[in-house]
Curated annotation (Swiss-Prot):
Organism: Nostoc sp. (strain PCC 7120 / SAG 25.82 / UTEX 2576)
Sections of the chain in a coiled coil: none
Protein EC: 2.2.1.2
UniProtKB keywords: Cytoplasm, Pentose shunt, Schiff base, Transferase
Domain of life: Bacteria
Protein known as: Transaldolase 2
Cytoplasm listed as a keyword: yes
């Protein structure tokens, strides 16, 4: 019998979540099968995933029509659809949540991307989503923007599970884990239990390589006379995201060894795990599981789209690699400053955050528009 590498990865301390959710996979039993037999122990969703699930799918039409008859505005109809899917997915994952002592079994749902730069609106929506969905194993996604992190701190203090999303730079990750720590400290100071709260920090991968590879390709296209310069550029291609992630993991290790974290751990606090996101390979020249193989290790999560789950189950090469090649990772990131390469990684990360928010705003607005069209069709004349 062939080895299912997804189950093998779990033995190295990494949880595999799925970056996909739709009513189809819930009702068909596919999600239940993935959870019970394939080792999937969490779900992440985002506005792009919901647009794909809902926009051209008749499975939602009866609920849309019910919302129209009830006189609900389009946005409330949208929420009724996604909240129902989130609740059902939470129920399927509840046994995992219980069996893992609340480490896994979460379903992530993002606050509206249109409020990414509004702290108070993010806090309000996170509270409302958590209360209205009404499942302990729901995890609210909050973008790791300057405005998002104070919201993370506050909702953690209130006992809400948080997935901090759209993290690209190591510094943004460091800021995120400290926001989590401050939230726990605030909750502890109020005499409340901190042992039941979970959080992950979603660190994005493939988008970094797409951006930097594009810059390298542009340099190569302009022509490079020196063979050694061409070699320098080629060494960087497809390597920056993984190097960046390995450095972030080193920062994680430093922080959890600190006295400040150890004081919280003594009270039962769960570590905020790094979650590798954007893990499907976009370049056909790269391995379709490279963002899995290279980042397996303790206290991590990898959220995979369905195609990558299938590929990984088939041919991942499972080993603890998140802590290998660390010196080389630092060297690679440092090499971007070389005048011959001259890529400002901080500028790239800032660019990717702005782009990342837009990539969620656009499908969110597109879905609102398509829902509005359905609402008009189904409304009584």
């Amino acid at each position: 019998m062939a080895i299912n590498h997804l189950l093998e990865i779990k033995e190295y301390g990494q949880s595999i979540w799925m970056d996909n959710l739709s009513r189809d996979i819930i009702q068909s039993g596919e999600l239940k099968n993935l959870v019970e037999n394939q080792g999937i122990c969490g779900i992440t969703s985002n506005p792009a995933i919901f647009e794909k699930a809902i926009a051209n799918n008749v499975i939602y039409d009866a609920d849309i029509e019910a919302g129209v008859r009830a006189g609900l505005p389009t946005y409330k109809i949208y929420e009724s659809l996604i909240f129902a899917d989130i609740r059902n997915a939470c129920d399927i994952l509840r046994p995992v949540y219980e069996a893992s002592n609340k480490l896994d079994g979460y379903v992530s749902i993002e606050v509206p991307p249109t409020i990414a730069h509004d702290t108070q609106a993010t806090i309000n929506e996170a509270r409302r989503y958590y209360q209205e969905i009404g499942r302990e194993n729901v995890m609210i996604k909050i973008p790791g923007t300057e405005a998002g992190l104070p919201a993370v701190e506050q909702v953690i203090a209130e006992g809400i599970n948080v997935n901090v999303t759209l993290l690209f730079s190591v510094q943004s990750y460091i800021n995120t884990i400290w926001a989590y720590i401050r939230g726990l400290e605030k909750r502890l100071a109020e005499g409340k239990d901190i042992s039941q709260i979970a959080s992950v920090a979603s660190f994005f991968l493939s988008r970094i390589d797409i951006n930097i590879d594009g810059k390298i390709d542009a340099k190569l296209a302009r022509g490079v006379d020196d063979i050694s310069l061409e070699a320098k550029l080629m060494v960087v291609k497809g390597k920056v995201a993984i190097a960046n992630a390995k450095i972030a993991y080193q920062e994680y290790k430093k922080i959890i060894e600190s006295d400040q974290w150890q004081a919280l751990a003594a009270k039962g606090a769960k570590v905020q795990r790094l979650l590798w996101a954007s893990t499907s390979t976009k370049d056909p020249n790269y391995s379709d599981v490279m963002y899995v193989d290279e980042l397996i290790g303790p206290d991590t999560v990898n959220t995979l789209p369905p195609a990558t789950i299938t590929a990984c189950a088939d041919h991942c090469e499972v080993a603890n690699r998140v802590e290998t090649g660390v010196a080389e990772a630092y060297q690679l990131i440092e090499s971007l400053k070389d005048p011959d390469i001259n890529i400002d990684i901080n500028a790239v990360m800032d660019e990717l955050l702005i782009e990342g928010i837009n990539k969620f705003v656009q499908p969110f607005q597109s879905l609102m528009n398509s829902l509005e069209g359905k609402v008009k069709l189904l409304s009584p004349v």
